[in-house]
Amino acid sequence: MSNALYRGRFAPSPTGLLHAGSLSTAIGSYLEARSRGGEWLLRMEDLDPPREVPGAADDILRTLEAFGFEWDGEVVYQSRRHGLYRAALERLIASGRAYACCCTRKEIAATARRGLDGYVYPGTCRNGCPDGREGRAWRLRVDEGEWTAHDRLQGEHRQDLARDIGDFVLLRADGFWAYQLAVVVDDAEQGVTDIVRGADLLVSTPRQLAVYDALGQSAPGYCHLPVLTNAAGEKLSKQTLAPAISTRDAARQLREALAWLGHVPPADCGSLDELWPWAVANWSLSRVPAGPLQLPLS
């Protein structure tokens, strides 16, 4: 993809408002795209209504605008793209790469061992559901062997999917699309060439590579930025009660976030109109730390 126009994206989920961690990820994603003369897309990953906060999607957009982000094209909402995910799943079913699963979470927990990201599915329904039961979820049939994600900041990330993850869900039993399928379908359909996101998602990258492979698609490049943690070392998130960022004094907060990412603006860059051009001109991944960053930073 080296000869293609760089196309990045930021894809927040409206399960809460933006916090310092999501802001730093948005900044890194944006600057990597703009510093390379590329495009930056915005996608709302709103596929899990029970977890979503009413009004959060609009608030996220207002916050990004207040901080001076400028995205290319219209905002894409996953909730309006079910047909694309259904078509992809049907292709995987037709090729034998996906199969129906009737197992409940309780049944899996009773027989499976722990892996890198939850229980490793034991393959109960790989050759068909037990008699009298109908599968409601769909899983990707994972091949044996190691998958390697080449990350521009974190280096090589190797994972044996069959051993460490197992056949993973594409469509949940409750009818909601799984992240691993939707994110691949969207990035491929939108022509995303490079993904810059938080390092907490590095563990899921080999699964996405497997979906790309099963669909016959080329995978994008990856770069996983350091996550921000609280004083207890927990990733900033809704679950750890990370406070939402305020749009007041956006320039000061942008300066702080740039410093977290290894880019300290000069003292005479005081406004958003001054900070963004400086950041685009001076952005370099070589200055971004790879490991987690604990707040507050001195």
From Swiss-Prot:
A motif ('KMSKS' region) lies at residues 235-239. L-glutamate binds at R9, F10, A11, P12, S13, E45, Y179, R197. This is Glutamyl-Q tRNA(Asp) synthetase. Its cofactor is Zn(2+). Belongs to the class-I aminoacyl-tRNA synthetase family. GluQ subfamily. Catalyzes the tRNA-independent activation of glutamate in presence of ATP and the subsequent transfer of glutamate onto a tRNA(Asp). Glutamate is transferred on the 2-amino-5-(4,5-dihydroxy-2-cyclopenten-1-yl) moiety of the queuosine in the wobble position of the QUC anticodon. The gene is gluQ. A motif ('HIGH' region) lies at residues 12-22. It comes from the Bacteria. It comes from Chromobacterium violaceum (strain ATCC 12472 / DSM 30191 / JCM 1249 / CCUG 213 / NBRC 12614 / NCIMB 9131 / NCTC 9757 / MK). Binds 1 zinc ion per subunit. Its EC number is 6.1.1.-. Keywords: Aminoacyl-tRNA synthetase, ATP-binding, Ligase, Metal-binding, Nucleotide-binding, Zinc. GO terms for biological process: glutamyl-tRNA aminoacylation; tRNA modification. The keyword Ribosomal protein does not apply. Transmembrane segments: none annotated. GO terms for molecular function: ATP binding; glutamate-tRNA ligase activity; zinc ion binding. Zn(2+) binds at C101, C103, Y121, C125. ATP binds at K238. GO terms for cellular component: cytosol.
